[in-house]
Amino acid sequence: VPIAPEPPVVRKGHVTFGTANNPYKFTTACIDTWAVVLRAVPDSRFVFLRPEAGAQGFIANARRVFEQRDVDPARIEFIGVRGAHLPHYNEMDIALDSLPHVGGTTTCEALWMGVPTVTLVGPGFPERLSYSNLTNAGLPELAVHSVEDYVATAAALAADRARLRQLRRELRSMLRSNPLGQVERFVRHFYAKAAEVAGA
């Protein structure tokens, strides 16, 4: 799937955050945190890239919960597609991972499409998969350990248009040159770490 040559902020004039994660991961803490990010970047938008995003009930609920958190519901956008969704990542500048249960496949998809993902790392496996993906893609700095750092990292990335443009152009090649995109290398590292833990 082709990546757009520039992130959408270049043509739209505002940063678009977004998610393609499963709605069951949209906890109260998750929505709270996303709302803080949107308030920290006042001209930004947030897009839901999900099959459910075409349903009027989903749209109404999403707008309501953000409005309750002092975010103008007009800033919330929806792309309701099933199946051929990868091209629509071209409408997203930065993916905001769900929390505490993070993405896995969706994080890889976003990175493949040149969209950096900010994630919050927790103690359990469901809270660390994106951390593994980002670290093995060469972007460990986007995996943070507090909500405050999550917001600060997202806001700083939104303000750095040069980096957004660079990542849009280079992320796919970064994946190919890092363990996440090199199966044999990843497996070697994984088994070496497993052996280290088993011998500890």
Task: Show where each model-derived region lies.
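Conserved beta-propeller blade repeats
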Residues: 84-88
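Extracellular/periplasmic ectodomains of large secreted or surface enzymes and adhesion receptors
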Residues: 1-12, 158, 162, 192, ...
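C-terminal alpha-helical cap of glycosyltransferases
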Residues: 182-200
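Catalytic binding pocket for nucleotide-activated donors in carbohydrate/polymer assembly enzymes
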Residues: 89-90, 94, 98-183
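A structural motif in glycosyltransferase catalytic domains
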Residues: 30-34, 150, 190
